[in-house]
UniProtKB/Swiss-Prot annotation:
Its main location: cytoplasm. It comes from Lactobacillus helveticus (strain DPC 4571). The keyword Aminoacyl-tRNA synthetase applies. PROSITE patterns: AA_TRNA_LIGASE_II_GLYAB. It catalyses: tRNA(Gly) + glycine + ATP = glycyl-tRNA(Gly) + AMP + diphosphate. One of its GO terms (biological process) is arginyl-tRNA aminoacylation. GO terms for cellular component: cytosol. It is an enzyme of class 6 (ligase). Tetramer of two alpha and two beta subunits. This is Glycine--tRNA ligase beta subunit. GO terms for molecular function: arginine-tRNA ligase activity; ATP binding; glycine-tRNA ligase activity.
Amino acid sequence: MAKDYLFEIGTEEIPAHVVPRSVKQLADRTRKFLKENGLKFKDIKTFSTPRRLTILVEDLAEKQDDIDEVKKGPAKKITQDADGNWTKAAQGFARGQGMTTDDIYFEELKGTEYAYVHVQKEGKKASDILLGMSDIIKAMTFPTKMRWDSNDFEFVRPIHWLVSLFGSDVIPVKILDITAGRKTQGHRFLGDSVVLANADDYEDALKDQYVIANAEERKDMIVNQMNELVKKNHWQIKPDRDLLEEVTYLVEYPTVFAGSFDEKYLNIPDEVLITSMKDNQRYFEVYDENGKLINHFIAVRNGNKDYLDNIISGNEKVLVARLDDAQFFYDEDRKYPLSHFVDRLKNVSFHDKIGSMAEKIQRVRMIGDYLAKRWDLPENVVTDFDRASELYKFDLVTQMVGEFAELQGVMGMHYARLAGEDEEVSVAIKEHYMPATAEGPLPETTVGSLLSVADKIDTIITFFGAGMIPTSSNDPYALRRYAYGIVRILLNEKWSLPFNEVLPEIINMLGGVTPAKLPKGDSEQEIADFIRDRVKQYLQKNKFKYDIVDAVLASSQQDPSQILAAANVLQLHHDDEEFKPVVESLTRINNILKKAKFNGKVDVDESLFVDNSETELYARVQNLQNIESLADLYQGFVHLQPVIDQYFEANMIMDKDENVKNNRLAQLYAVSELADRLGDLSKLVIK
């Protein structure tokens, strides 16, 4: 007969972000433990709060299945020597089945005698196996661990109680001096301890003691109560899954309430108010029906509605203290012109191995001007970029950003607007940090995109130059994210940038104006390859077929926009009827060139043509040389494919005449160079 098994670890408050992954780990480890021990079960449910990690194993078998089976071993000639003594092979076979050599017997199978044993074993009781749950606790891992008392044992937080019930029976799992029983604890302030008669009583018994053990139920309670408040007051709130998740794991019994603050604080930029409420206090900001931020907030307490007025008043006082600070910083910062802050950047270090923030600004402007010229950007964009690049780091030395570091860029935008800067300049100051995460929003303005790319290129170049290069396991300065951001912006703006050409030019340009150590030689290509690797990340993220990704990245192409264009062409035509013969023809050419070890240093000489097919191929290839679009180039290959086949039919490539042979190889090399713009087509999986 199967019964439910309850296992609860009661602790001091666990950080909210650690709770969900910890209870999942407990469930995963338990699932593996039960399967390894041959205990059947239906499923594992999880319960979790800041003070408990709990699993409920549904329909757990009371014992392992009994074993009654015949095990086949090695051949008889291997199990006994000439004198009939048991060999080590026989002893090992018997021992592996929990038997002795006395239990071995022989039977013939297809003309050969083999050793057998008849294994009969009664399954172990679940109650005995479950004592091993203590090993699961000891094996659990966490971002940080704590010790308590004088023990060496570590856990995410000190353990205060354990519950271990198999149906109605206690399984006395033990950790340190704590032995599991049937007593659990209710809410720290509102509930009492409760003795569980049966594992199935857990959820309802805790509800009576003001603990909602089911995290999804707590989340639903929070959402429903918030919706009631919003509807009642004609407000709006913006969904914030991360904050909702956090408050769900901060409380055991949620009660939602609304508070307010003086309207005078609404003169502060919205982002400051939201940061003060959300990041510092875990409040949800509130908007009116028109989507405008208003002087109210919604919060969640860990308790019931008793004394709620006192709770609201206390939360309002804490928030007002923070808003007073924010108002002071805002007023103080606005007393000075932007030039005051820009001048102070001379004394702000970008990195002690690289130089000051002012020096970085100088480099970024040069990089941006170089890129703008390369991309032939409009004069007004260049003018706005130059001004934005002069200002874009000034808010780092403002008091507001000193208090709210996460608002760098945002406050720069607001202060620039207040100072009368052009909107494009102001917005670019904010956008240069974008994308802030790998898949975060990209800059929406051209100036912002240019500034972001220039800033990130400078960061990568100077960090590589200083020897601070990411390893496979360590990237403390987020250089991979910066490189991926560069790739995403370039592709979004459709800007061409072959890094193997551009980086040496940028580094050479910066060499005479910056004291920062810059990369040289192989390091330049190392940076180009580093950024190019992020193109692979982009292609994989956007669901390109793995063989297409391998093919386009195996080409000599260094321009992300061209690599993406090649991937799009190959993905688009991958299933076309003519795709296979085109790829096979081009791959055949590459194979011939590799086998001949041809280096391509011979020009095609038309006077050496023997057959009309050579003239035809030469003319067609000449026409393809001028095609810029990879989509058009592919179509050119479609039409070229029968010409290539005819060329092979009519000509012996490895002709006895050395000049003719090299001339034909040179023709094939010209085709191969064009095909390389699409990638190494031999890596494509063609069916």
